[in-house]
A protein has these predicted regions:
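Short acidic linear motifs
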Residues: 1-156
């Protein structure tokens, strides 16, 4: 009878690679291009909206120990310190979409050049439960939201 089990040799552990936000964005786009048409990039997301970087290791040159987060609705990608932004984008985007289905006007603060979303109007009409901690803006591109206040100069 053996008291001790023989240890299995462990696979050599690879060192984590450091990647930039731009590298992750390029890797996600390349992943989506390489996949079959019916497989969207949101399949890379975990329940907490972090990106499963192990599935991007062939595009990144290894597995990163960093965390990046993506909005399910706008596909914007963020670093860990901005992990609250994708959730806000998704909640408010759903509220804006529902609002636009029932109203002809835009839920933006009147007079703002960058079309800042009017949270009070969305809350008052029961499309949003609470105000996000950051301002969001309604773009002209399919009425998608962004967190960038200067989005108007980037679309042209």
């Amino acid at each position: 009878m053996r008291w001790f089990k023989r240890r299995k040799p462990s696979a050599p552990r690879q060192e984590a690679v450091h990647v930039t936000l731009d590298e992750v964005k390029r890797a996600v786009l390349q992943y989506e291009q390489d996949m079959q048409e019916q497989i969207p990039r949101t399949t890379l997301l975990r329940p907490d909206q972090s990106i499963d970087l192990s599935r991007l290791k062939r595009y990144l040159g290894g597995i990163s120990d960093q965390r990046f987060y993506m909005s399910r609705m706008t596909y914007e990608i963020f670093e860990e310190q901005d992990m609250h932004i994708p959730l806000s984008l998704d909640v408010v985007q759903a509220a804006v979409d529902d609002y636009l289905d029932h109203h002809d006007d835009l839920p933006v603060i009147p007079g703002t050049r960058n079309r800042q979303v009017h949270y009070d109007k969305l809350i008052e009409r029961h499309y949003l439960k609470e105000k996000p901690s950051i301002p969001l803006y309604l773009t002209t591109e399919q009425f998608m939201l962004t967190h960038e206040p200067d989005w108007t100069g980037r679309l042209h």
